[in-house]
Amino acid sequence: MDDRPAAATAASDRLARGPAGDRLADYARMLRRAGAIADDAGERAFATVPRHRFLTRFRHQRWHEMPCDGPVPEEILDAVYGDNPLAFKIDEDSGQLVSATTRPSLLARILGALELSPGMRVLEIGAGIGYNAALIQAVTGAEVVSLDVQPDVIADAEEALRRCGVDGVVTVVGDGYDGHPARGPYDRILASCGIRGVPPAWVEQLAPGGFVLAPFAHGGAHPLVRFRLERGRLRATGVGPWTDFMLAGGALYQPFLGAHPARFAAGPFPEPTLSRQAVAPMTGEDYGDLWFFLAARSTRVTQAHVGGIDPADA
């Protein structure tokens, strides 16, 4: 039996119709087989919310333009319904990446970590293309508030949501640091960007029993962390996986979040102190744990990658 609210069921069924319906079903099954989706509600959401309809232009190996009408080329559907993050906004002057979609398998794990159920109210910090909010709304059937500091991002997300017939998402232009108290309290607050600390406003806008889920940026690593208010104190629990989200802008941004802000000449470095110990090889996840541990204890910790040095010569 489908236990979604009627509004969510109708919206999802409407979104699923169309030539890409089989693609959506295969896409959802792929994510579930990979262990990224853990329950039927999540699989239904990914099988009914059309990711390609939220994109007008994206980069995967090269730039692609999404057709406004008519059939969508197979090459585009292959890119969109593979497990690929897709760049969709580049700074015209610098050529630097400004915005990109989340890798679907990571997004599915994040939605699972939210522990959503019908009727929950959710605040999303960082609107992206509107796809995340549409997935959340497909699961909860309740209002989702999606907030972003960039007016053009909100305008594009609004247009995509209208295009897909999603009417349960409220989009707001504003600084994520302040949250959005006007439509709170929220059962869940999701940050879709790397943050260094939890703003007090988010804690104040949580409903009883609610929590904040955010990629917590320390030492260049972004573990997914759940923050709950327990006995007047904020308790953090790592729920994984390690992520690589773009850092928040506006008041949420703090410099030195893990990488040196500018390129600098390598050396001369002071004479190192060497300690020779037999230790097991470290995986990428081990290094993430190490950098997070160090940076959580000192804001001075950063990373510098120095080329031309062979550890075997040390």
Report each predicted region and the residues it spans.
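Class I SAM-dependent transferase core
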Residues: 2-123, 132, 153, 167
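Class I SAM-binding transferase module
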Residues: 3, 190, 195-313
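Short, solvent-exposed coil/turn elements at secondary-structure transition points
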Residues: 52, 60, 175-177, 218, ...
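Alpha-helix boundary/capping detector
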Residues: 53, 57, 72-73, 136, ...
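Short, charged/polar low-complexity linear motifs in solvent-exposed/disordered segments
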Residues: 62, 142, 253-255
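Conserved nucleotide-cofactor-binding alpha/beta core module
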Residues: 102-213, 217-219, 225
